[in-house]
Regions:
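Alpha-helical cap/lid subdomain in secreted, periplasmic
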Residues: 27-190
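Cell-envelope and extracellular/periplasmic
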Residues: 12-16, 45-46
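Structural motif
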Residues: 15-27
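Serine-esterase "nucleophile elbow" of acetyl-processing enzymes
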Residues: 1-13, 30-34
Length: 194
């Protein structure tokens, strides 16, 4: 029986969005060398773009200077404020739906262009689309639907460039990953990662 040997290197960073991927990860010489040697490249980017936008939207709607450490913290503040003013939920949905996707798309294109230029001939690229990271959080259903619409639009951007950059999209949006998250309710646990 022939043995198959492999090496896995994980460059993931908590909180990293698409701009951070381009500015911090894909400028690192070690990462670039690793990408150039890899037979298979897995990419998961985008959820933090959404979560950061959510935090900014809540900050704007609540008219606060509070720097939320997480989307969960921002949503908790929104929930508490919405208890006295339910119209705040509608404001956040409206704000999220007006999000300008152009920056995410520009970052995505830049990232894929860089990786495409670094990878060796014949290397596979597999990207995950975005699941609903707030599905397990206690938020109003109308807001959850607004978040899902934003995610669908982001996933369309990811899928739009698959052929151009030769990558496959692993559909985690339709998976049960939301059933397997860490205590923060956002990030997949070990089972969710698998």
């Amino acid at each position: 029986e022939e043995e198959f040997q492999y090496e896995i290197t994980n460059y993931a960073r908590n909180g990293l969005d698409s701009a951070g991927m381009n500015d911090k990860i894909l400028t690192d010489e070690e990462v670039c060398d690793s990408v150039g040697r890899s037979d298979v490249i897995f990419i998961t980017v985008g959820s933090n773009d959404l979560l950061n936008e959510c935090k900014s939207a809540v900050q704007e709607i609540l008219d606060t200077d509070t720097k939320f450490k997480s989307a969960g913290e921002a949503l908790k503040a929104l929930r508490e404020s919405a208890a006295g003013n339910p119209l705040l939920v509608l404001k956040i949905i409206e704000t999220l739906e007006q999000w300008d996707y152009q920056m995410f798309e520009a970052n995505w294109i830049e990232m894929m262009h860089r990786i495409d230029g670094m990878k060796k001939e014949g290397a596979w690229i597999i990207v995950t689309n975005i699941y609903n990271p707030v599905a397990n959080l206690d938020i109003p259903s109308t807001m959850d639907r607004g978040v899902e619409n934003v995610i669908r639009n982001m996933n369309q951007i990811i899928e739009k460039y698959a052929e151009e950059y030769g990558y496959q999209v692993a559909d985690i949006f339709s998976s049960e990953v939301c059933d397997h998250v860490q205590p923060d309710g956002l990030h997949p646990d070990q089972t969710g990662q698998q």
